[in-house]
């Protein structure tokens, strides 16, 4: 059974803190295994990559078979159902339209002292996109990760996708083909992350790695960060639904399960001001679980990590939401707009009863790669700026340098950095 809490109960605060502190991340043995895999790929390159791929994905490969040929990509994409490809194309159009609005503008101006100041944006040169291939395969993630990179102007976009038992999802290949990814490798897990970060004889290294994955992939991204950039450390999926009694309990139950079905470690939380409605949602969850193909995963997630929280009013709810800082926040209430304005910490907010989180996962337009594990307190969802770098520009002539340098010399001397001061003083004609 999910945890049930009420703000009216004396023990609420302690129980809520325990809910926030519950660990759903990877264990030490995962970190140790990932370290060994990364060290192996860094040291032995293709040989280690092939060895791990053969072991974990149960497929016999050689270095010359790691990369998919253009013919393999096209043939795989052709096997995708046409109506689903059409849906992917609609999603791609909407995702691109939204993300084009994120493109930043540069700055270039001359200040009153005559100093030219500015900043410019340039795309990252090479990005690796990790696409999962485990308990579920996600062509939508290809679009959500690749399209912002393409909009940003990334020149080289590399995709890795595991092929368990030699099988690749046709829709994943169709999505890759749709966004123009031509460099695809049939590898996954920590070994794929290592190959993208360190490079091998077959795979040139990239500058940044993005994309979701399991605990091993998350641990690998954490370990290679610094050598390459990463988008974020994605933990298990989360949803928090704020709902009143005017909702259909079956709708809200399905919304909760939409994240619970991702992973046993996923978390679904319902906050409501009506105990009878909350009970009805819990009953609806049980009914849905009798029918869902991924019921075993969803049931484990709901029973082990789910929670129902009863509040007196939306003031209490907003305070709790900000403490949870959920990845996905549904506001299935009449006052959705006004409550949304008061929420400070959420990866994405879905407004009203007719905006289920699932519409954002696929086709609304904003990115579905969002901060988890309470990191929405300081992080944002994936976007165009994640694939760009900002460089600042400073230009002085003799007059503007003469106006600014004396103050800079004083600061350099105060910090004991005499060469700094000297480089300025010499330009002023001081010995």
Language-model-detected regions and their locations in the chain:
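C-terminal core of ALDH-fold dehydrogenases
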Residues: 314, 322-431
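Conserved small-residue-rich beta-alpha loop and adjacent elements
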Residues: 109-174
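Alpha-helix C-terminal capping segments
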Residues: 144-155, 177-179, 197-203, 221-223, ...
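N-terminal Rossmann-like NAD(P)+-binding subdomain of aldehyde/semialdehyde dehydrogenases
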Residues: 1-125
């Amino acid at each position: 059974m999910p945890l049930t809490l009420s703000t009216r109960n004396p023990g609420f605060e302690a129980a809520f803190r325990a809910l926030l502190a519950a660990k759903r991340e990877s264990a030490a043995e995962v970190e140790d295994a990932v370290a060994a895999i990364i060290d192996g790929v860094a040291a032995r390159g293709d040989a280690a990559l092939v060895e791990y791929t053969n072991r974990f994905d149960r497929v016999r490969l050689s270095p010359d078979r790691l990369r998919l040929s253009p013919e393999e990509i096209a043939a795989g994409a052709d096997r995708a159902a046409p109506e689903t490809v059409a849906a992917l194309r609609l999603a791609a159009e909407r995702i691109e339209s939204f993300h084009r609005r994120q493109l930043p503008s540069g700055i270039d101006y001359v200040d009153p002292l005559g100093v030219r100041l500015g900043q410019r944006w340039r795309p990252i040169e090479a990005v690796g996109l990790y696409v999962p291939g485990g308990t579920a395969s996600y062509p939508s993630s290809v679009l959500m990760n690749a399209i912002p990179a393409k909009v940003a102007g990334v020149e080289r976009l590399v995709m890795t996708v595991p092929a368990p038992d030699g099988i690749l999802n046709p829709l994943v290949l169709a999505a890759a083909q749709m966004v123009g990814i031509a460099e695809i490798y049939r590898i996954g897990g920590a070994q794929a992350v290592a190959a993208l970060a360190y490079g091998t004889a077959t795979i040139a290294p990239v500058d940044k790695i993005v994309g979701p994955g399991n605990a091993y992939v998350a641990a690998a991204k954490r370990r290679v960060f610094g050598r390459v950039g990463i988008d974020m450390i994605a933990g298990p999926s989360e949803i928090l639904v704020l709902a009143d009694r005017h909702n259909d309990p079956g709708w809200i139950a399905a919304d909760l399960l939409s994240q619970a079905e991702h992973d046993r470690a996923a978390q679904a939380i319902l906050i409501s001001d009506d105990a009878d409605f909350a009970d009805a949602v819990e009953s609806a969850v049980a009914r849905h679980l009798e029918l869902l193909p991924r019921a075993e995963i969803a049931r484990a997630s709901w029973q082990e990590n789910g929670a129902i929280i009863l509040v007196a009013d939306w003031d209490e709810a907003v305070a709790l939401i900000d403490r949870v800082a959920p990845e996905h926040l549904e506001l299935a209430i009449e006052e959705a707009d006004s409550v949304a304005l008061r929420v400070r910490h959420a990866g994405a907010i879905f407004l009203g009863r007719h905006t289920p989180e699932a519409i954002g996962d696929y086709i609304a337009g904003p990115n579905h790669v969002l901060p988890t594990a309470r990191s929405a307190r300081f992080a944002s969802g994936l976007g165009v700026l994640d694939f760009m770098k900002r460089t600042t520009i400073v230009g002085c002539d003799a007059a503007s340098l003469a106006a600014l340098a004396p103050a800079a010399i004083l600061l350099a001397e105060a910090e004991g950095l005499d060469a700094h001061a000297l480089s300025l003083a010499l330009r002023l004609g001081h010995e």
